Design a protein with these regions (language model features):
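Transmembrane beta-strands of outer-membrane beta-barrel proteins
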Residues: 24-26, 36-40, 77-79, 92-96, ...
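Electropositive, surface-exposed helix/loop patches at the edges of structured domains
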Residues: 20-28, 205-212
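Outer membrane beta-barrel strand-and-loop segments of large Gram-negative receptors
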Residues: 8-14, 20, 26-27, 34-93, ...
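Flexible, solvent-exposed coil segments and beta strand-coil junctions
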Residues: 1-7, 17, 51-61, 94-100, ...
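Conserved C-terminal beta-signal and adjacent last beta-strands/turns
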Residues: 109-237
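Gram-negative outer-membrane beta-barrel proteins
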Residues: 1, 31-33, 43-51, 86-90, ...
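A general structural signal for short secondary-structure junctions and capping/turn motifs
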Residues: 15, 25-28, 158, 197-199
């Protein structure tokens, strides 16, 4: 990589074994309210991870990979959806907790909390939405990296009629920097923190104008802003 860091391969690397399990329970006590409990597990065994050893008499480091690690990721959460005022107001929230555990060459334990929320209001042909998402914090197994991005918030206003849909979205309007995430690696001989740039978490305005042609097949319009309906599930990323 540079004069202080060299890299080598490992022909003895083995394939890892993976296990995935999912559980979900939906509860709809009223027509305008629904909730979902979900739990998900992902395990990876004998995964390869980066290892660092002294090189050239300790003047540099040699980066390689070894099959030495076990990775566990469990997510437990709830999803709520509430419709008010004849479905003109829709509220949604999805709080969840992750349990990360990594053993072997790296000993990592993290328990981050996250929540996604949104509120949508429909007024005749107009619709408005506000949404917020906490930073995502994950442990990336094969890289032994702790990853944390930024929180995300947006305001949306739109108009839809006769096949036309015009939407204006204001995203992260109070954030002027271009930092998207941080990645941290800690090992006995080497540690690093990387800043990941990008425009996804930077402030911006998006304007969208679309027109739907009702030809040949009946087209169902509506749900312009991802209207919440029924109980939602979640997928781990």
């Amino acid at each position: 990589l540079n004069e202080l860091m060299y890299q080598t391969g490992n022909p003895d690397l083995k394939l890892s074994r993976q296990v995935t399990a999912n559980m979900q329970y939906n509860w709809i006590p009223r027509r305008n309210f629904s909730t979902t409990f979900f739990a998900q597990y992902f395990g990876e065994y004998d995964l390869y991870v980066p290892v660092f050893t002294p090189y050239d008499g300790g003047k540099a480091l040699l980066r390689g990979y070894d099959t030495d690690g076990t990775y566990h990721r469990t997510q437990v959460g709830l999803s709520f959806n509430l419709h008010l005022a004849g479905n003109k107001i829709q509220l949604a929230a999805q709080p969840s907790v992750y349990f990360y555990r990594m053993t072997g060459h790296y000993d990592i334990s993290k328990t981050p909390f996250s929540i996604h929320t949104s509120a949508t209001f429909y007024l005749n042909d107009f619709y408005f939405q506000a949404s917020y998402q906490t930073p995502e914090r994950t442990v990336q197994g094969n890289r032994a990296v702790y990853y944390k991005d930024r929180d995300f918030y947006q305001l949306l206003a739109g108009w839809s009629k006769c096949g036309w849909n015009v939407r204006l979205t204001a995203i992260n309007m109070f954030r002027s920097d271009w930092i998207g995430a941080t990645q941290t690696l800690n090992s006995p001989l080497y540690s690093e923190t990387r800043l990941v740039g990008g425009n996804y978490f930077h402030r911006r305005l998006n304007l969208s104008v679309t027109y739907t042609l009702n030809y040949g097949k009946k087209v169902q319009q509506g749900n312009e802003v991802g209207e919440q309906s029924g109980a939602a599930s979640a997928i781990m990323k």
